[in-house]
A protein has these predicted regions:
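N-terminal beta1-alpha1 cap of cysteine-dependent amidohydrolase-like domains
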Residues: 1-95, 103-111, 115-147, 155, ...
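Cytosolic ligand/metal-binding cores
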Residues: 100
Length: 244
């Protein structure tokens, strides 16, 4: 049985880890939860899950400007685990904060506080859902086609895309005209769109040569509690498993 390390320890009040475990076990994979890079020994892949705090903006050369509960010590653990996985060329899936960690690790930056955060932010009373456009030629398009309605729980997102990455999914604010959306999708497909924005949020990224990809949304939370109208979350985990 192949093993996958899920980076993290401690309580799991929002079922971030348990959702990943459920998905992995459903695919016949063993989940190991740890923040120690050494525990990647014997593992076939790594999942960087979501959660708080925000990544320290000093890691991408910016002052604090909207990031919350920054904890450099925790960042160091996450980046250390990711570095070991990259060194071993292991498949990596980053979810929400994990997607942001991947982007920053490879040289990208983040929008520290989205102007459209109310559309994306966590709501304890209900599951917030919005549509995304999947970029042709990426894993997201292969899994879901042109559009993927997803859940959302974040106030930050990728700004400057890491150099070795492509965009897999985008969210557009309703204020962006349809023809402009089409142009931005074409730019993302061509690799010429390299920055996210408050009204054009990068929701998925993928490395051009390594088995590494990230999602700004939360497929793991949809595994145990599906939300009507959203995508099948297991497609993401099956894709990850196919890379192991």
């Amino acid at each position: 049985m192949k093993r996958v390390l899920i980076a993290g320890t401690g309580p799991d009040p929002h079922h971030i880890y348990s959702g990943c475990v459920l998905a992995l076990e459903a695919l016949g994979l063993e989940a190991v939860q740890s923040m120690e890079a050494e525990d990647l020994e014997g593992c076939s892949g790594l999942i960087l899950p979501g959660g708080v705090p925000d990544v320290d903006p000093a890691r991408y050369g910016e002052p604090l400007a909207g990031s919350l509960d920054v904890t450099p010590e925790l960042d160091e653990q996450y980046f250390s685990v990711l570095a070991r996985a990259v060194e071993q060329n292991l498949p990596v899936l980053g979810i929400c904060r994990g997607c942001q960690v991947i982007n920053v690790y490879f040289g990208g930056s983040l929008i520290q506080d989205l102007e459209t955060a109310d559309i994306h932010r966590f709501d304890p009373k209900k599951e917030v859902v919005h549509d995304t456009a999947c970029i042709p030629g990426t894993f997201a398009y292969d899994l879901y086609g042109a559009h993927a309605p997803v859940n959302t729980k974040h106030h930050q997102a990728v700004r400057r895309l890491a150099p070795e990455f492509g965009i897999a999914q985008l969210w557009f604010d309703d204020s962006i005209p349809r023809e402009t959306q089409t142009e931005l999708i074409a730019q993302a497909q061509a690799g010429t769109l390299t920055e996210g924005a408050h009204r054009c949020v990068i929701e998925g990224i993928c490395h051009r040569t390594r088995p590494i990809f990230g999602l700004q949304w939360h497929p793991e939370l949809l595994v145990d509690k599906p939300v009507e109208g959203t995508v099948n979350p297991m497609a993401v985990f099956r894709h990850f498993a196919s890379l192991l």
